[in-house]
Amino acid sequence: MKFFIKTYGCQMNENDSEVARYYLEQEGYESAENENEADIVILNTCVVRKKAEDKFLSTIGELRKKNKKIGVMGCGAEKLKEDLFKRGVNFVIGTRAISRIPEAVELSIKGKKAAIFDDKLDEIDYRNILKRNSKHHAWITIIYGCNRFCTYCIVPYTRGREKSRKMDDILREVKNLSLNGVREITYLGQNVDAYGKDLNDGTSLAKLLNETKKIENIERIWFLTSYPTDFSLDIAREIASSEKIAKSIHLPVQHGSNKILKKMNRRYTIEEYYELIKSIREIVPDASISSDIIVGFPDETEDDFQQTVKLVEEIKFERLNLAIYSPREGTIAWKYFEDNVPRAIKTRRMAYLLNLQKEINKMLNESYLDKTVEVIVEERAKSGLFYGRDIRNKIIAFEGDESLIGKKILVKIKKTTAGPLYGDIIKII
């Protein structure tokens, strides 16, 4: 019997889908190339925004017409639970019960409904999950959940409280992957720099990075996503200490106004955020810092917005993920705050920040012209060019062929834009 997993949302969902595939294949189920070839279609879902939720709910309706067995995992499973049965779903798996997915599939084949939400994270045998969606790169979840409870965010309710994996288990996974051709890893967590705090044994992200950089064949180490007050300068020192650790730090700020930050329950002031960025840049002068910002949060005034503009102008992020605020059912903001910023104003403010960031990107990228950088080749783009990233997470495109994927090359930059950089391969390293 064949299954197909359709993944929505974040990188952690990508990793969870790899885990689910492993457990199903261990029980003899066969992975299909697409949903049309599959007897069972499993949707690994996202509900961070309403649009993402609507998308997978629409897919359920389409699959019902094709008479497929339907399973739902991910944050949508946690949010909607057994209510999904009313939509024709056959089984639902919680974010911490992925190792039990064969049990749910078996029950659905027998015509029974299955809903499994137990915390079975400790059962996951990550050391033997060697089949990844990329041959040279692996997503590695090191901490689950989030304790921060930002007022706009559904994640603590769908992913639970923070729970770290043992460091030895993570390092064994990385070593096994390195022996299987993986050269690049990304450590994942909703709040990755909180890693180890719940273990109460001195474990930390900085110590994990220190041990990981010693593993032979691993050429680049990434991590995301960070929370400002959990980001220790020991992490920055580890980045500065090794050419293996990417000089790319994703540090969501969400807003430039202290009033709005407090309303978001972000637990830091904008002055503290500025000071953190200053300290990071003192330790890692060439650090590439990216961020997230929400536009149009309840009670955001023009003055609040201008403080965000000032933040973006002064810090000059290398990359900025922008989102217009929309209430998410189940969050504190949805329950208690009026969504009182008109849509037209939200859209105008969003457009202004998009244009501002585009100009910043263009200016920052111009400094790359005629430079030679190390790139790990990822894949072919739709344009036909191949692309990869340098140690600062710049996307660089070039002429190449399939044999280069996963290899480290030197590229001389010949053209810059506000987005990708373009260059010529100098040599394979």
From Swiss-Prot:
Q: Residue limits of the Radical SAM core domain?
A: 132-364
Q: Where, per UniProt, does this protein localize? A: Cytoplasm
GO MF annotation, one:
N6-isopentenyladenosine methylthiotransferase activity
Residues that coordinate or bind [4Fe-4S] cluster 2: C146, C150, C153
Q: What EC number(s) does the entry state?
A: 2.8.4.3
What the entry lists under CDD domains is as follows:
Radical_SAM (cd01335)
Start and end of every TRAM domain?
Answer: 366-427
The UniProt note on the cofactor reads as follows:
Binds 2 [4Fe-4S] clusters. One cluster is coordinated with 3 cysteines and an exchangeable S-adenosyl-L-methionine.
Q: Which residues form the MTTase N-terminal domain?
A: 1-110
The record, for InterPro entries, names: Elp3/MiaA/NifB-like_rSAM, Methylthiotransferase, Methylthiotransferase_CS, Methylthiotransferase_N, Methylthiotransferase_N_sf, MiaB_methiolase, rSAM, rSAM_horseshoe
Q: Which UniProt keywords apply?
A: 4Fe-4S, Cytoplasm, Iron, Iron-sulfur, Metal-binding, S-adenosyl-L-methionine, Transferase, tRNA processing
This protein's cofactor list reads: [4Fe-4S] cluster
State if 4Fe-4S is listed as a keyword.
Answer: yes
Q: Could you give one GO CC term from the UniProt record?
A: cytosol
Q: What does this protein do?
A: Catalyzes the methylthiolation of N6-(dimethylallyl)adenosine (i(6)A), leading to the formation of 2-methylthio-N6-(dimethylallyl)adenosine (ms(2)i(6)A) at position 37 in tRNAs that read codons beginning with uridine.
| PANTHER family assigned to the protein according to its UniProt record, in alphabetical order | CDK5 REGULATORY SUBUNIT-ASSOCIATED PROTEIN 1 (PTHR43020), MITOCHONDRIAL TRNA METHYLTHIOTRANSFERASE CDK5RAP1 (PTHR43020:SF2)
Q: Which NCBIfam families does the record match to this protein?
A: miaB-methiolase, MiaB/RimO family radical SAM methylthiotransferase
Quaternary context: Monomer.
Family statement: Belongs to the methylthiotransferase family. MiaB subfamily.
In Swiss-Prot or TrEMBL terms, this protein is called tRNA-2-methylthio-N(6)-dimethylallyladenosine synthase
Can you name the source organism? Thermosipho africanus (strain TCF52B)
